[in-house]
Amino acid sequence: GSNRERSQIIMRLSAEGLKDRAKWEEAGYALPKFDREKVTEATKENPFWIHFGAGNIFRAFQANVVQNLLNDGILDRGLIVAEGFDYEIVEKMNHPHDDYTILVTLKADGNIEKTVVGSVVESLTVNTENASDFARLKEIFAKDSLQMVTFTITEKGYSLVNGKGELLPDVEADFVSGPEAPKSYIGKVAALLYARYQAGEKPVAMVSMDNCSHNGDKLYAAINTFAEKWEENKLTDAGFRAYVNCKEKVTFPW
């Protein structure tokens, strides 16, 4: 009925909808305790952490951890998230809700904890056909402030071959077309890392957070393969592969 519709309008998950904090708190939601506009501005200007993979693991863990650190005043900047498989997560979930999400946690005692998570302040598609998103990703990767690039893209996200050990068609095409407009996921990540190399060989930690053995090695092997092929095919500066392999500059911890 009209009452229910009215309450849904009032409880809209967006920057505008969250202005009525009392309404949300009465309904049992914990809200961000930090100045989100200020955090958004600082993060976009000087991003320090970008995460690839905008799924549930990211929303429940990385985003929630950063929210707690922002709430406690330990951090002054939030997260940027990029999605490379399912662009609709960004276009139909993140953007309409101003990058806010709701985390519902079932506690051991049976209580349900509801939290509005506001630590993600920008979301982008990892899509070379979306020129503005990919240009923005390159801009983020060129920033001095960037320290950490993290991933939850599933184990298969790092694979360059199919079940038979044959190169995936997109990967094969990317090896010969170079870093301008790659189609494969790791090709796009390698192209972004190349943008960081071109901006002055700036240091960065490339951190796989997927639950697989030696996850950092898998990420390194995939990116290094691109660096090798692109150098072989004279599609990048000669120093890019050395940059990927220089542990003072780029690390792949596991």
Give residue spans per PLM region.
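Non-transmembrane, aqueous-exposed alpha-helical and coiled segments at domain scale
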Residues: 9-254
